[in-house]
Amino acid sequence: MFKSKHRMDDVITALTKGIAVYETLRTYNGKPFALKEHYERLKKSLSYLKIEPPAFEDFEKLVYENLSERMRIVYVYSKSLLEYVFQEDTEEFKVEYVKVDITTVRRADPWSIPPDLKSLGRPDIYLARLTKGDNYDVIMLGTKGQVCEGTFSNVFLIKNGKFITPSLESGILDGITRMYVIRFLKESGYEVEERFVEPAELFYADEVFLTHTSRGIVPVNQIGTLKTKSVELSSKLSKAFEEYVKCLL
């Protein structure tokens, strides 16, 4: 479902030119999660494109006027107008665990395309998604072969009770849910390490999970052909994190 402030032909023009940035939002009990953080990241994406952002008050009003459990707001730029499109996420929400793989498509060099630019025109993300097949998501490596992230998710590993996730210096998007999950884990007494992660570590980890706005913590039980991953702890954390977020709102 799309909702637009201006003519759809202008929106389509902007989308085909790739002049569009977006944010995916999630609501809990009718309240948007991390609205201010999503706005700040949207503002940063627009700043890369030298586009003046909307005021937070206007953004907030827009979100509440189009509220749904999971939604995406796309800002497009055409003919000197900043426009918006709303898309409601209609995918099945409940998922116990998922299968992922490592794609051969590398994350773009961060010096060429900033990792925190959430643009519809990113060729690396698009090409990686074409390799997804029946996987929930595919994990992209960086220019040095390090683990970066999924095409729409961040990656966490659990090894010997320690949580490990690629650092921002690895060339990843500073995921909002990632940030909250790190905070949640530390407040729960777990050790969290942010650093460069080698691909082999994914296969030797005790557990692996993804994080993203729409679904919070998503346990991974299979990477490629390796179907031996436990999801015991990550499944418990998935439920606990949802309750944690609700308490914050």
Regions found by a protein language model. Give the residues of each.
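Ordered, amphipathic secondary-structure segments that act as subunit-interaction surfaces
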Residues: 69-77, 87
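Helix-start/capping segments and mature chain N-termini
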Residues: 1-65, 82-249
